[in-house]
Amino acid sequence: MKTARLQVTLRCAVDLINSSSDQCFARIEHVASDQADPRPGVWHSSGMNRIRLSTTVDAALLTSARDMRAGITDAALIDEALAALLARHRSAEVDASYAAYDKHPVDEPDEWGDLASWRRAAGDS
């Protein structure tokens, strides 16, 4: 398996697009580590928390992802991948919590009665 070394040094600047909006959009810039920028950026005192990520990844996987999302930085690509991973994990947690309901049918009585009767009564009111 071929691997590629992905080293990302990030500087993130947050620009408020519309001051009347609660939404802000982040502009992510890929800055080479050997470049010195004497200007303190917006990110210096009020930006998103960012870390440096240095890892080895599958070259074909990285190339395919870059081709699929052409035009975005590696940092944004990694952000999207991590967000998708967390969303999938959260979805699995929700599915597992619903599985608990399958163990006990809605009309199964417990110490408080049964949920089906309660739903009918609530619907009639």
Swiss-Prot record:
Induction: Repressed by Mce3R.
Species name: Mycobacterium tuberculosis (strain ATCC 25618 / H37Rv)
Entry keywords, A to Z: Toxin-antitoxin system
GO biological process, one term: positive regulation of growth
Domain of life: Bacteria
Task performed by this protein: Antitoxin component of a type II toxin-antitoxin (TA) system. Upon expression in M.smegmatis neutralizes the effect of cognate toxin MazF5.
Protein name: Antitoxin MazE5
Assembly and binders: Forms a complex with cognate toxin MazF5.
